[in-house]
């Protein structure tokens, strides 16, 4: 795992997403020309350095995760629901990205970018050794690099803080590590799409874009 810093004025993701409290609102912004311009600059200027390559393969647009204050999460992907009960398993959304039904390829590197200072009560946790979960205690302006295919990770189910946590996550690799030959025919789940397999989805011009500096 590595923590990286970025310029929040130059890459003003929080400003662009401010006041957006549902996934639909957030993704509308992320698909906008204004956001895409900032995103592509971030990829070309920052991620190429981190991946040590002038040619990289990166998720076209980031995924959004939202965890409102004083709420339980429905699951690891969706908006949260209001807390109505106690005693739920706080780790029941722990997963590896290689797990069924997502089957992310092993060449992916994960990046997680929260848009607030996070705490032990609203951050992502990573299983650094069996049954040992460590919080990613990042400040605004930092983002985490980790290998999500081999490491269990996820948020606690309940956000007990006063802070609404929005975060971006995205995956990619240096072009030299991108290898379509390892992709298989296993069916995968993609919201709004049908009949997709790993080798049809995790390729350039579908899930990924090719960036060259």
Please state what every model-predicted region is:
Residues 68, 115, 128, 172-174:
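Residue-level signal for short segments within beta-strands and strand-turn junctions
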Residues 1-13:
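Glycine/small-residue-rich interface belts in oligomeric ring/scaffold proteins
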Residues 73, 120-122, 177-179:
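Intrinsically disordered, low-complexity acidic/polar segments
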Residues 62, 111-113, 168-172:
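A structural signal for short, well-ordered beta-strand segments
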Residues 77-147, 165:
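Catalytic core of non-heme Fe(II) oxygenases with the double-stranded beta-helix
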Residues 130-213:
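Catalytic core of Fe(II)/2-oxoglutarate
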Residues 14-100, 104-106:
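Signature of the catalytic double-stranded beta-helix
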